[in-house]
Amino acid sequence: MKKILKKPIVHAPVLRRLCYVMLAALMITGVFVIHTSAAEADDLLIGSVSAKYESNGNPATISTGAGDTGGKSYGAYQFASSYDVPYTFAQWCIDSGSDAAIGQQLINAYRADGNTYGAQFDSTWRSIAAAQSQHFLWLQHGYIKAQYYDPTVSQLYSRYGLNVNARSLTLKNAVWSRAVQHGSGGCLNLFAALYAADPSFVSLDDLTIVTRLYEESGAVVNTPPYSNSQPIVKANV
């Protein structure tokens, strides 16, 4: 499975602090100030920390890509262009029936740019976000959930009996964030390391699991090739 996002470099204590700060902000003030159904609002809380820190939850965001192994990145979760995730997202919009019209607009713009992420694609991405901001955010969230979060959650239960759906929002957001950061397979590798160190880790409280998960993630992102990224990239989680 392709990686979604650029790989940041940040030491484990910083990763933990950022996670806790964003979770506290979420609990105190909320992250998304938008009108949704109750079910959508509950679902959007999962992944809100990742989106808040990556882009302030803005579906229109396009990064410059400077100094980033992921290249120019798009949307609330910063889909990495060098891994063709924006194109894969557009195709998913069509194939899943989530919004074929938006998916086709993005693919047409990509082709107009000569199968690259150029001016046409950027303009189309921003215009969709301007016209349908909430809907576009929901599509991006739905793509991450279907392609990365849900498969990770399923495998965690199958392999370790860890029922993430029955655990706290803190743990759900941590799993989402690491699946976004490392891909589903990479996130599962982090949990494999936790299991190797402590086969009974599932019985631990959620905060301890989150702490250990971010420590393992920090060890991964501090190894090449990601350790060669520019400082501006290193600040991302």
Task: Give the positions of each predicted feature.
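N-terminal secretory signal peptides that target proteins for export/translocation
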Residues: 1-14
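Short, intrinsically disordered, low-complexity terminal segments
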Residues: 9, 21-22, 35-38
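Extracellular interaction modules
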Residues: 17-18, 143
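Bacterial N-terminal signal peptides
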Residues: 18-31
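Sec-dependent signal peptide cleavage junction
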Residues: 28-41
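Cell-wall polysaccharide-cleaving catalytic domain and substrate-binding groove, primarily
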Residues: 38-162, 170-237
